[in-house]
């Protein structure tokens, strides 16, 4: 795992087309902005896991959504 330190307003690049910008820090929460092409899916981890479990036909952990 690559670990980077960024300040508010600073950006990192993933490949040539994806940028991740630190928008703000408040307590233990960090707000980030992600710019990516439409063909690149961007999800929070828990949403991605729910999508994957729905694709495989497994019931989701949290009940109905």
Curated annotation (Swiss-Prot):
Where in or outside the cell is it found? Cytoplasm
InterPro entries reported in the protein's UniProt record = CsrA (IPR003751), CsrA_sf (IPR036107)
Chief place where the protein resides: cytoplasm
> What keywords appear on the UniProt entry?
Activator, Cytoplasm, Repressor, RNA-binding, Translation regulation
- Name one molecular function that GO assigns to this entry: mRNA 5'-UTR binding
What is one cellular component GO term in this UniProt entry?
cytosol
Does Ribosomal protein appear among the keywords? no
Q: Does the keyword RNA-binding apply?
A: yes
- What biological processes does GO assign it? mRNA catabolic process; negative regulation of translational initiation; positive regulation of translational initiation; regulation of carbohydrate metabolic process
Known function: A key translational regulator that binds mRNA to regulate translation initiation and/or mRNA stability. Mediates global changes in gene expression, shifting from rapid growth to stress survival by linking envelope stress, the stringent response and the catabolite repression systems. Usually binds in the 5'-UTR; binding at or near the Shine-Dalgarno sequence prevents ribosome-binding, repressing translation, binding elsewhere in the 5'-UTR can activate translation and/or stabilize the mRNA. Its function is antagonized by small RNA(s).
Assembly state and interactors? Homodimer; the beta-strands of each monomer intercalate to form a hydrophobic core, while the alpha-helices form wings that extend away from the core.
Similarity comment: family membership: Belongs to the CsrA/RsmA family.
- The name under which this protein is listed is Translational regulator CsrA
Which organism's genome codes for this protein? Shewanella sp. (strain W3-18-1)
């Amino acid at each position: 795992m690559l670990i980077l330190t960024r300040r508010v307003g600073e950006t990192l690049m993933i490949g040539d087309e994806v940028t991740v910008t630190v928008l703000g820090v408040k307590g233990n929460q960090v707000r980030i902005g992600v710019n990516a092409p439409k063909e690149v899916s961007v999800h929070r981890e828990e949403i991605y896991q729910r999508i994957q479990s729905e694709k495989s036909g497994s019931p989701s952990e949290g009940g109905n959504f």
